[in-house]
Swiss-Prot record:
The gene is prfC. Residues 10-279 form the tr-type G domain. Increases the formation of ribosomal termination complexes and stimulates activities of RF-1 and RF-2. It binds guanine nucleotides and has strong preference for UGA stop codons. It may interact directly with the ribosome. The stimulation of RF-1 and RF-2 is significantly reduced by GTP and GDP, but not by GMP. This is Peptide chain release factor 3. GO terms for cellular component: cytosol. It comes from the Bacteria. GO terms for molecular function: GTP binding; GTPase activity; translation release factor activity, codon nonspecific; translation release factor activity, codon specific. GO terms for biological process: regulation of translational termination. The keyword Transmembrane does not apply. Belongs to the TRAFAC class translation factor GTPase superfamily. Classic translation factor GTPase family. PrfC subfamily.
Length: 529
């Protein structure tokens, strides 16, 4: 390990933003880029009727619907730190893609709408974070709108998510009377005006809450309310404990309004000062340190057609150790072949730049013509396999039928590419030539339909089919597995990677089959090979 490598790793931050739909996540992403100098002007974010679209929502279906359905990777600098930000899908039907993103980050930022508190999707994503003990910072957004009282919001988070809250900033007023935030750990007050579309300048700083100037700036009633709140918090709130945050048991909480630039600086400061630098990554044989000399990384996402004009596919690779150099030769372990990575890119949403070098914690894009899949590991020599990137059993199914039988080749190509991205799962029954799509949420079918038509010129009919869930099956006894296949072939299919799966018409039927075949193992998730 060189001094440069140690310094580069310490300066890296890789985090994902998670939230319920419409909590303001994409707006916050844009403001981070704005404050980091990556973009000059924030878009008219999420104005659903506006012609413009948010910088990070670049796929046409996202612009049309005003939701994020794929993961955007964005890179920017703030202070002396190099930040890799993963803007995850907020829509509940895309939790599978979000989960895969959470395997690539070192920490997460949870965005909560002050008017709604903790919502269902946030709870689901929190479960995923807890599986990995991911450190989480919380941003309570939209304080410039009428919402729940700050103390009620903290209680809501603690009760529903079973995580201790440690507020680090505190709002002054709310709704139309929102005047700024008080920084509890720096003991200073920052007042803001709505920033509109440009970066907000630093606010006025007041070190002492008893300063008469405070009342002049925000009014006596707000000043008195703030003093009372801070006195109450100093006695009742949980003090921030770095160790508890890093273990995932405590979340520091910040208040603000992303669209008006309230509280963004404090949040960015916390992300570089508190959030962890890249750490150990689990592989099948051992844990891998970012300070190791040899390069290693894994693919957590495939995105087809980022530029429809070029029909390209990009593999998103998280670097786990060593240093990446342009043109370096690596071993692609799943297929056992060496490859030269000469055209890696980094991202600012749809914009890309060629990479000469990259370090642990960075996300690079590798051009891919179908040989790279989710979960693939690249190293200089050691045959590592990083773990914890699963497929989830789908809960919704559709049969795909072509309107024009002459387009079968385009359909197969489109389905193969979309399945490798993880946008949808494809099952091919043992007893028919059907294509059956499986998804965690029904919106994935709409996205698949739109993308097949727009990117592959394929028009299909999507027919509901009587399946309720799927399980991947395996049995160490080949003779018994053959008997199982013969007895249940009407419900068996191969997934996109050729793995055998049982498609169940109901939970009762699944339980019945499991009971009758106790030596066959039924898996609810499957690691990417």
């Amino acid at each position: 390990m060189s001094k440069q490598q140690k310094k580069e790793v310490e300066q890296r931050r890789c985090f994902g933003i998670i939230s319920h739909p419409d909590a303001g996540k994409t707006t916050l992403t844009e403001k981070f880029l704005l404050f980091g100098g990556a973009i000059q002007l924030a878009g008219a974010v999420k104005a659903r009727k506006a012609a413009r679209h948010a910088t990070s929502d670049w796929m046409s279906i996202e612009r049309d619907r005003g939701i994020s359905v794929t993961t955007s990777v964005m890179t920017f600098s703030y202070r002396d730190f190099f930040i890799n930000l993963l803007d995850t899908p907020g829509h509940q039907d895309f939790s599978e893609d979000t989960y895969r993103v959470l395997t690539a980050v070192d920490s997460a930022l949870m965005v909560i709408d002050s008017a709604k508190g903790v919502e269902a999707q946030t709870e689901k994503l929190m479960e995923v974070c807890r599986m990995r003990n991911t450190p989480i910072i919380t941003f309570i957004n939209k304080m410039d709108r009428d919402g729940m009282a700050p103390l009620d919001l903290l209680s809501d988070i603690e009760e529903k998510l079973q995580i201790e809250c440690a507020p680090l900033t505190w709002p002054i007023g709310a709704g139309k009377g929102f005047a700024g935030v008080y920084n509890l750990y720096k003991k200073e007050l920052q007042l803001f005006t709505a920033g509109g579309k440009t970066r907000q300048k630093d606010g006025i700083v007041i070190q002492d809450l008893d300063d008469p100037k405070l009342a002049e700036l925000i009014g006596e009633s707000k000043a008195e309310e703030l003093r009372e709140d801070i006195e109450l918090l100093e006695g009742a709130a949980n003090p921030f404990e770095m160790e508890h945050y890093l273990s995932g048991s405590q979340t520091p909480v910040f208040f603000g309004s992303a669209i008006n630039n309230f509280g963004i600086t404090e949040l960015l400061d916390a992300l570089v000062e508190m959030a962890p630098a890249p750490g150990l990554r689990p592989a099948e044989s051992r844990d891998v340190s970012p300070l190791e000399e040899d390069f290693s990384g894994f693919t957590f996402k495939i995105q087809a057609n980022m530029d429809p004009a070029h029909r390209d596919r990009i593999a998103f690779v998280r670097i786990c150790s060593g240093k990446f150099n342009r043109g370096m030769k690596v071993m692609h372990h799943r297929i056992g072949k060496e490859m030269i990575i000469s055209n890696a890119t980094m991202f600012m949403a749809q914009d890309r730049a060629n990479v000469e070098e990259a370090w642990p914690g960075d996300i690079i894009g590798v051009h891919n013509h179908g040989t790279i899949k989710i979960g693939d590991t690249f190293t200089i020599k050691e045959p590592l396999k990083f773990t914890g990137i699963p497929n989830f059993a789908p809960e919704h199914f559709r049969r795909v039928m072509l309107k024009d039988p002459m387009k079968a080749k385009q359909l197969n190509k489109g389905l193969t590419q979309l399945a490798e991205e993880g946008a949808v799962q494809v099952f091919r029954p043992l007893t028919s030539a059907d294509n059956i799509l499986g998804a965690v949420g029904v919106l994935q079918f709409d996205v698949t339909m739109a993308r097949l038509k727009a990117e592959y010129n394929v028009d299909c009919i999507y027919e509901a089919i009587d399946y309720n869930t799927a399980r991947w099956v395996e049995c160490p006894d080949n003779k018994m597995l053959d008997e199982f296949r013969k007895a249940n072939q009407a419900n068996l299919a191969l997934d996109g990677e050729g793995q055998l799966a049982y498609l169940a018409p109901s939970q009762w039927r699944l339980g019945f089959v499991q009971e009758n075949w106790p030596d066959v193992v039924f898996h609810k998730t499957r690691e990417y090979n």
